[in-house]
Amino acid sequence: MDSQRNLLVIALLFVSFMIWQAWEQDKNPQPQAQQTTQTTTTAAGSAADQGVPASGQGKLISVKTDVLDLTINTRGGDVEQALLPAYPKELNSTQPFQLLETSSQFIYQAQSGLTGRDGPDNPANGPRPLYNVEKDAYVLAEGQNELQVPMTYTDAAGNTFTKTFVLKRGDYAVNVNYNVQNAGEKPLEISTFGQLKQSITLPPHLDTGSSNFALHTFRGAAYSTPDEKYEKYKFDTIADNENLNISSKGGWVAMLQQYFATAWIPHNDGTNNFYTANLGNGIAAIGYKSQPVLVQPGQTGAMNSTLWVGPEIQDKMAAVAPHLDLTVDYGWLWFISQPLFKLLKWIHSFVGNWGFSIIIITFIVRGIMYPLTKAQYTSMAKMRMLQPKIQAMRERLGDDKQRISQEMMALYKAEKVNPLGGCFPLLIQMPIFLALYYMLMGSVELRQAPFALWIHDLSAQDPYYILPILMGVTMFFIQKMSPTTVTDPMQQKIMTFMPVIFTVFFLWFPSGLVLYYIVSNLVTIIQQQLIYRGLEKRGLHSREKKKS
């Protein structure tokens, strides 16, 4: 085996990964949603089986902090819109990214309230509560670190229910506190609930990457329990009415998309019911309902939960709830992507540029892997030295494949050569490459992160395709510098066009990933020269053997 055959192996692994990812996307198509209506009454009404009644019409109030711009409906106190001022919708745009939305085209809401036998959100007790508020707009003032939005409702029996949203400066975690004052003569049985509901199919203006394999990340529901740290739940599974229904102490429920997440984290000592539901009208939901608590006559009961609505910032999410940081979609190689990101973030704290951080981490990774790379080239050099003996053996034994195989194994053993020695380092490099791919696609810190010159977003493709072309050029030079024993005409043709094929593939890949591959190729060129010089001294390499 030689380095050009190794390139072929990399290509096959790479193409196999792309085919697998495309197959995963095709075999789990998102169901086609029916037309959604502008109001949310019909969709939410279908959730009555889960104890979440229809919203109906209420007054919309505005709640703004330095990082959140929320719209809350006084009917039920649901968050119907969430804008993130710190995250532009698009590069160089003045419009903030919208996470939650209630429109004729798309519904994504964070619902919450009090249900149970005596809860005002129980459908059996009538329409959802219409809360009273002191004003229509709440703004976190300069110098203020906390903003409270109290909403009150008094039922026909005189019981008072207060729902207070508590927001803090620079924080995407919103505390939702409930106070229940029992003015009656019987205990009140109350449960809290939190539900996220979303249109299953994205409208055209939001569907920015479902047809592009390079932008494929998970969009759907997820949950966490003490037994299951992180479990995804696909929208199409909910649409097929294969619903979640489990009990858990602690944990959370969430809806995820690339870079952003919404999650409900219940805070109580009892058991919560985690569920998913097909609400009809093309809308899926995931939520929790707490174990009922009793509020005695003349007493006040307190309950609370937390809503995360914002970017997937791992350290902040981990501080809000255990394992909430796992919502960052690093795919099946998360155990490699997470430490890579921590290292990348540490480097960024010194250099202040994500592009230069990628360059530095590339040198670190390739430096750590240098012993394997050296072993790979040494093994390939020994294999090349054995080629004349192997060729003579083939001519001597003719078509006796069994004898050829036996004598080749004996030859490898006698010469202390591992025929797979050139492949093993590749099997290590490929997962690292794919883990970096997932890291770049899943880390919100790299979203719209500039590098230099024309690269203004490392998570997006190069708009002028300069980096992919440079990558192809470096790959071409590696090929030219590598010795080869490939004699099969078909393999020779494949190897000739391999830089072109890879260049085409990388046209749509994130600039940060292409940058990593360019730097990695440059390191390979340097390491090749150093290793070949050492092999020449040992008589295992000759520059005359290079392919011209």
UniProtKB/Swiss-Prot annotation:
Q: Which GO terms describe its molecular function?
A: membrane insertase activity
Q: Where in the cell is it found?
A: Cell inner membrane
Main location as per UniProt: membrane
Arranged from A to Z, the UniProt key words for this protein are:
Cell inner membrane, Cell membrane, Chaperone, Membrane, Protein transport, Transmembrane, Transmembrane helix, Transport
InterPro entries reported in the protein's UniProt record = Membr_insert_YidC, Membr_insert_YidC_N, YidC/ALB3/OXA1/COX18, YidC/Oxa/ALB_C, YidC_ALB_C, YidC_periplasmic_sf
The transmembrane residues are 6-26, 350-370, 420-440, 458-478, 499-519
- Could you tell me which residues belong to the region Disordered? 28-55
Q: Which GO terms describe its cellular component?
A: plasma membrane
| GO BP, sorted A to Z | protein insertion into membrane; protein transport
- Amino acid composition bias (Low complexity), ranges on this chain: 30-50
Tell me what topology the record assigns in the membrane.
Multi-pass membrane protein
Q: Which Pfam families match?
A: 60KD_IMP, YidC_periplas
Q: What does this protein do?
A: Required for the insertion and/or proper folding and/or complex formation of integral membrane proteins into the membrane. Involved in integration of membrane proteins that insert both dependently and independently of the Sec translocase complex, as well as at least some lipoproteins. Aids folding of multispanning membrane proteins.
Q: Which family does it belong to?
A: Belongs to the OXA1/ALB3/YidC family. Type 1 subfamily.
HAMAP family the UniProt entry points to = YidC_type1
Self-association state and partner proteins as the record states: Interacts with the Sec translocase complex via SecD. Specifically interacts with transmembrane segments of nascent integral membrane proteins during membrane integration.
Name-wise, this protein is Membrane protein insertase YidC
What organism does the record attribute this protein to? Answer: Escherichia coli O139:H28 (strain E24377A / ETEC)
What gene name is listed for this protein? yidC
